Amino acid sequence: MAETAKEAYLALIAARDPEIRALLDQGFEFVTNAFKVDAAPSGMKARTDQEHVGRLQQAGYQVEVTAVYDEQGQLRPSLSAIWRKKP
């Protein structure tokens, strides 16, 4: 049984998406979910997925972007999941 809500969520999405399972197996760490460019609700200030990727790459991380699933395992097409790994 998962020890935390985050671990339970990661287990759920890894079971749904082989790309996410592969990233976890390769040692990638989940960072955050972020809106895709032009997908944030009007008037909301938020960093986009591309902004997160750029900042992490500047910090020296290998970065991957995948689909996002909610807590019920449903795809969220306006969001991207950001993953990082130190090379």
Feature names for model-found ranges:
Residues E3-K6, T32, Q57, V63-V65, ...:
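N-terminal cationic amphipathic segment used for targeting or macromolecule association
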Residues F35-E71:
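Short, hydrophobic/π-rich interface segment
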Residues E7-Y9, I20-R21, V53, Q72, ...:
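Generic N-terminal initiation segments characterized by hydrophobic and/or small/turn-forming residues
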Residues Q62-P87:
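C-terminal edge-of-domain segments
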Residues M1-S42:
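An N-terminal amphipathic alpha-helical segment
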Residues P18, D49, Q57, S78, ...:
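Small/flexible residues
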Residues A14, K45, V53, Q74, ...:
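Intrinsically disordered, low-complexity sequence elements enriched in Ser/Thr/Gly/Pro
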